[in-house]
């Protein structure tokens, strides 16, 4: 978390030089920048819930431009907002954005070589970008690596929820890996059992997108930290891998086969293979998912209420339909959500539902809020939280620990 009170005079000195367009000594400038928390964060006079955030990039060779891709702030159609400015006769590129003080999001920086077309630059804000982004070398916070080898930096401002459990480290429990037939295909499954006394009741958290949580985000160490900090009760974590991105879209979402296989076959098998453990009952059995996986979590409440006592749905893809006739960019606040209607056609009594969404996720926000209210009206225990951010593992990580914390009650 970036503390704007750290070295305020040094931050002011750098910002004043940038504003004046004159750097007294370039070597001293970069030495000072490397000693500070970058991006540089300063308060906004008269707006206590906002911050001015200054990003820096040091160019090692001539460039046409540098683009800051910040989740749901400068990405997608907002590429122009993320274009940095060069200070003449220096190697400095900079951009200052005014952001909510509670913002948490991932970002990367893209160098734009000379001769790059406007079309290529415009594509840089979306999934079809051809220019490779890099993490911010001046950002001292742990990087995030969601898929592949592309690392991103994380901006967590001072009023955002803390992410201390995700600061890296090693897990101390037992990690078991196996191949299982789930939903008709062989998949890698990871079971993490924390190092706790076998006499303690042990809950179970099931995570689709297991390869992301285990290979890229370090969920095992985070669970250990949260247990040790008494933020959550002891839980094991069961991750179910996708085979590839295409297959992920085939199996996650509103389909029932994955849910029924997990509830009817996988969980009984996993527990039977660990008979020495004191497995907690369904009240501490959790299904948690994000995006398409967020819909799968809701389907856990719909199709397996006897198995899951709590589901955590983060940024659910409320646009999803079985016919695949809808897309995120075409789904508006006034459209009917198949997801909501299907879930409410048989309200999952006895299942606690935690809905979370990023404040910058457009039409998803009102749809999630409406689903929350309708669930309550239907007699379902529903919780709803809005995190300041986008469609992003940066805050989904924290929401996972927050959601598991509901088991304390």
UniProtKB/Swiss-Prot annotation:
It is an enzyme of class 3 (hydrolase). Its main location: cytoplasm. It is found in: Cytoplasm. Keywords: Cytoplasm, Hydrolase. It catalyses: Fe(III)-C-5-deoxy-beta-D-glucosyl-enterobactin + H2O = Fe(III)-{di[N-(2,3-dihydroxybenzoyl)-L-seryl]-N-(C-5-[deoxy-beta-D-glucosyl]-2,3-dihydroxybenzoyl)-L-serine} + H(+); Fe(III)-{di[N-(2,3-dihydroxybenzoyl)-L-seryl]-N-(C-5-[deoxy-beta-D-glucosyl]-2,3-dihydroxybenzoyl)-L-serine} + H2O + H(+) = Fe(III)-{N-(2,3-dihydroxybenzoyl)-L-seryl-N-(C-5-[deoxy-beta-D-glucosyl]-2,3-dihydroxybenzoyl)-L-serine} + N-(2,3-dihydroxybenzoyl)-L-serine; Fe(III)-{N-(2,3-dihydroxybenzoyl)-L-seryl-[N-(C-5-[deoxy-beta-D-glucosyl]-2,3-dihydroxybenzoyl)-L-serine]2} + H2O + H(+) = Fe(III)-{N-(2,3-dihydroxybenzoyl)-L-seryl-N-(C-5-[deoxy-beta-D-glucosyl]-2,3-dihydroxybenzoyl)-L-serine} + N-(C-5-[deoxy-beta-D-glucosyl]-2,3-dihydroxybenzoyl)-L-serine; Fe(III)-di(C-5-deoxy-beta-D-glucosyl)-enterobactin + H2O = Fe(III)-{N-(2,3-dihydroxybenzoyl)-L-seryl-[N-(C-5-[deoxy-beta-D-glucosyl]-2,3-dihydroxybenzoyl)-L-serine]2} + H(+). InterPro entries: AB_hydrolase_fold (IPR029058), Enterochelin_esterase_N (IPR021764), Esterase-like (IPR000801), Ig-like_fold (IPR013783), Ig_E-set (IPR014756), Mycobacterial_A85_antigen (IPR050583). Gene3D superfamilies: alpha/beta hydrolase, Immunoglobulins. One of its GO terms (cellular component) is cytoplasm. One of its GO terms (biological process) is iron ion transport. Its EC number is 3.1.1.109. One of its GO terms (molecular function) is iron ion binding. Pfam families: Enterochelin_N (PF11806), Esterase (PF00756). It comes from the Bacteria. Transmembrane segments: none annotated. Catalyzes the hydrolysis of both the apo and Fe3(+)-bound forms of enterobactin (Ent), monoglucosyl-C-Ent (MGE), diglucosyl-C-Ent (DGE) and triglucosyl-C-Ent (TGE). Shows higher catalytic efficiencies on Fe3(+)-bound forms. The initial linear trimer products are, in turn, very good substrates for further hydrolytic cleavage by IroD, leading to complete degradation of the trilactone to DHB-Ser and/or Glc-DHB-Ser monomers. Hydrolyzes MGE and DGE regioselectively. May be the ferric MGE/DGE esterase responsible for cytoplasmic iron release. PANTHER family: ENTEROCHELIN ESTERASE-RELATED, IRON(III) ENTEROBACTIN ESTERASE. Belongs to the Fes family. This is Iron(III) salmochelin esterase.
């Amino acid at each position: 978390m970036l503390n704007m009170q750290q070295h305020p005079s040094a931050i002011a000195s750098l910002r004043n030089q940038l504003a004046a367009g004159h750097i007294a000594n370039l070597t001293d400038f970069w030495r000072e920048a490397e000693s500070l928390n970058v991006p540089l964060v300063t308060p906004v006079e008269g707006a206590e819930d906002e911050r001015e955030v200054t990003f820096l990039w040091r160019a090692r060779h001539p460039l046409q431009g540098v683009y800051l891709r910040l989740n749901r702030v400068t990405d997608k159609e907002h590429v122009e907002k993320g274009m940095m400015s060069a200070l003449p006769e220096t190697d400095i590129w900079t951009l200052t954005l005014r952001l909510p003080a509670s913002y948490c999001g991932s970002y990367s920086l893209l160098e734009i070589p000379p001769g790059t077309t406007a079309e290529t630059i415009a594509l840089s804000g979306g999934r079809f970008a051809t220019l490779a982004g890099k993490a911010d070398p001046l950002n001292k916070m742990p990087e995030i690596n969601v898929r592949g080898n592309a690392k991103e930096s994380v901006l967590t401002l001072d009023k955002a929820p803390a992410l201390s459990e995700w600061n890296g480290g090693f897990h101390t429990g037992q990690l078991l890996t196996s191949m299982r037939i789930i939903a008709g295909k062989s998949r890698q499954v990871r079971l993490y059992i924390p190092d706790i006394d076998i006499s303690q009741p042990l809950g179970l958290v099931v995570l689709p997108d297991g390869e992301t949580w285990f290979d890229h985000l370090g969920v095992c160490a985070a669970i250990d930290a949260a247990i040790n900090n008494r933020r959550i009760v002891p839980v094991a974590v069961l991750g179910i891998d996708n085979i590839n991105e295409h297959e992920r879209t085939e199996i996650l979402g509103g389909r029932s086969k994955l849910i029924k296989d997990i509830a009817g076959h996988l969980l009984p098998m996993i527990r039977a293979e660990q008979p020495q453990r004191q497995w907690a009952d369904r009240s501490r059995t959790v299904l948690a998912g994000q995006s398409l996986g967020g819909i799968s979590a809701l389907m856990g409440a719909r199709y397996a209420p006897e198995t899951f006592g709590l589901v955590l749905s983060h940024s659910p893809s409320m646009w999803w339909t079985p016919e695949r006739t809808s897309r995120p960019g075409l789904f508006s606040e006034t459209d009917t959500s198949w997801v909501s209607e299907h879930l409410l056609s048989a309200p999952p009594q006895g299942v606690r539902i935690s809905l979370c969404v990023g404040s910058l996720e457009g039409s998803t926000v009102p749809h999630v809020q409406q689903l929350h209210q309708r669930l309550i009206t239907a007699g379902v225990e529903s919780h709803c939280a809005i995190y300041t951010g986008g469609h992003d593992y940066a805050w989904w990580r924290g929401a996972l620990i927050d959601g598991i914390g509901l088991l304390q009650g």
